[in-house]
Amino acid sequence: MTKEQWGQLQQRLLKTVGQNNYKNWIEPIEFGSTQDGVATFEVPTNFLGNYVSQNFADLILHEVRQEDPAVRRLRFAVPSHVNATTKPARPAQATAPRAPAEKTPRSTLSTAPLDARFTFDNFIVGKPNELAHAAAKRVAEGGPVTFNPLFLYGGVGLGKTHLMHAIAHELRLRRPEMNVLYLSAEQFMYRFVQALRDRKMMDFKEIFRSVDVLMVDDVQFIAGKGSTQEEFFHTFNALVDQNKQIIISGDRAPGEIKDMEERVKSRLQCGLVVDLHPTDYELRLGILQSKVEQQRKNYPGLDISDGVLEFLAHRISTNVRVLEGALTRLCAFASLVGREIDMELTQDCLSDVLRASERKITVEEIQRKVSDHYNIRLSDMIGPKRLRSYARPRQVAMYLSKKMTSRSLPEIGRRFGGRDHTTVMHGVKRIEELKIQDGQIAEDLELLRRALEE
């Protein structure tokens, strides 16, 4: 294959992968040579080469074989001359020293947009989120750094992003002189990749290490992405060394994020780790009552019958976003048809949402989730083996089956290899004891319960 053929092949790939993927991952690749059935391509960085190898290699190989059927394998490598040409370039910049890090203008930080609705005033506090709210308020005061990082975690729709935005809003109001950078972990990765591709890593490092407060949402996104984790790790350390505040959110506790490097997990756990628990009935009702007052600004004549909000708070229990979305839809529908929001209208308008909220969790689903979580075969967990590595997950699955399904103890026992109901009862009791004594068991139960409810 020739370089001209590679250019034609790239155009075909453009149609397949789309403009953004092509620009980021395919366009920087240059054809090198073919030898012994291996086509070698030159890439600007190891990170880009690894990403392309994992995500586009099969597609590229298919296209390459259309041009050269003898090619059986692809190789992506950084040419040896890249480092040789980039390293000497640094001394030439010594005549134009950069401004000190603390002088970096906020405009260059390009923070992600903040939702104006997500403030502390609009955050409804209840027992499930009171600790997270208190910690967020403390950080938002902008005073001395007392815990670093603040790590907020919880399931979808429990208020992590709301609190993150609220902190950023409050800091900008109280301390306008501070450089506050808020972004998602995905945006961090894309900026990192862009800097690698454009050979502007020093600019990237300077921007991220000049902030006063770094806020990263959904940190689990960088799990499994080695180069991004490494840069995040060094950025984290640099900011902590400068006594700058770091605030992170994730969908689970740092120790439970799969494919996250241990050194990164360790850093994330070294501050205050706070769990946003699933909402209870009282908190959901409070959220609905607050949202109704906001909706009345849009619909001044809004009329809601007694019992409707209580009904919704009972029926939609796992996700606050779904709850708020249901209320928004209901108010809009009632306004359009000119009707009072009563139980009949609510059930007609939200029939699909209410059906989805009735999804039944099965024993079999629980067994699969638990076996995956503990990395054991399902057949071993429900089989006769009594090794601790199988017995404890089995008891966890029995406990969750008892708590999250309507199955009786004998029915649960039959689904665990025909075990007697007393065995199930013993397993449930044992886990109830362990979740008080063993923090890891309690965390496993919470993580599994969330995964099953999502």
Curated annotation (Swiss-Prot):
Molecular function per GO:
ATP binding; ATP hydrolysis activity; DNA replication origin binding; lipid binding
Q: Is the Ion transport keyword given for this protein?
A: no
SUBUNIT field: Oligomerizes as a right-handed, spiral filament on DNA at oriC.
Q: Which family does it belong to?
A: Belongs to the DnaA family.
Name of the featured protein: Chromosomal replication initiator protein DnaA
Q: What is the lineage of its organism?
A: Bacteria, Pseudomonadati, Pseudomonadota, Alphaproteobacteria, Rhodobacterales
Using the UniProt annotation, give all residue ranges assigned to the region (Disordered): 82-108
User: Per the record, GO CC terms?
Assistant: cytoplasm; plasma membrane
Q: CDD domains given for it?
A: AAA (cd00009), Bac_DnaA_C (cd06571)
- Pfam families according to UniProt: Bac_DnaA, Bac_DnaA_C, DnaA_N
Q: Which UniProt keywords apply?
A: ATP-binding, Cytoplasm, DNA replication, DNA-binding, Lipid-binding, Nucleotide-binding
**Which parts of this chain are annotated as the region Domain III, AAA+ region?**
113-334
